[in-house]
Amino acid sequence: LSRGLGDVYKRQGWEYSNGMVADVDAIRYDAEGRIANLQTLGYREGLHKLSLGIGFSDVVRAAYRDVGTPWGYTLWAGYDLNPENRNFSDLVSAYARIYTPGFFRHNSLSVAAAYQTSVGGYRFPSGLRFLGYKSTRLLPRGFSSSDISSNNYLAGSVDYQFPLCYPEGGISGVIYFKRIRLNVGADYARFQEFGSRGKTWRDIYSYGGDLLLDLNILRMSAAATATVKLSLYKPSEGSCWFGFGLELPF
């Protein structure tokens, strides 16, 4: 269930989820400090996440051939907690993105930064740190939330986007191919992990690009443009990451 209040430029609200959460109070440990009853731990119902957030965004409307807004920015801050079980740590997170024109006409450059960290200390046992909350607003592409820790997590991202061509044709009344564009991006993140040697810093990064096809389907207006997106990124750990997506105008 979620609730929000705002207009085009300013948004603020709260959100909570009510479902199944691990019963951390029932955990038992063996003589070596490992969880002994993980397979039979079980779950319980109840409110297990409350999210508070506030954001502000202001952008300039893009021209017909622009690949993105020429000027703009987005700011957001959030706070996540578990009011039903205070064994969990809270999460503070912030995000910002700036949009500027590129080096050539109709190009676009955007730079983003994010920060998140757990507060209140790990009140639950160290073996359960994986249950802590994490923000996914800015993850290096090719990584997931399971690859990071929300301890002094700092991330940055740079994207440069430009048009390749404008087919401006298709099958009348069925599909209209508007534009093919390319986005080149790079991401970096640094955060702290807890191990046998205490706190250590870990760095991850990725780089690659996205091929995007803008199209209109079934006589939709020019403003109602859908986008087919193909992504290929090389993360600093593991093999190449490939993604496919469809962005709809609603």
Q: Which ranges hold each PLM region?
A:
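Single conserved hydrophobic/aromatic residue that forms the stacking wall/gate
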Residues: 1-9
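Long, low-hydrophobicity, solvent-exposed regions enriched in small/turn-prone and acidic residues
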Residues: 7, 15-16, 116, 190
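A subset of solvent-exposed loop/turn segments in beta-rich extracellular surface proteins, enriched
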Residues: 12, 16-32
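Transmembrane beta-barrel architecture of outer-membrane proteins
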Residues: 14-18, 90-92, 154, 205
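Outer-membrane beta-barrel transmembrane domain signature
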Residues: 25, 181-217
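C-terminal outer-membrane beta-barrel translocator/porin domains of Gram-negative envelope proteins
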Residues: 27-184, 192-194, 244-246
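Outer-membrane beta-barrel "beta-signal"
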Residues: 51-54, 208-211, 239-250
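A structural signal for short secondary-structure junctions
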Residues: 69, 149-152, 174-180, 201-205, ...
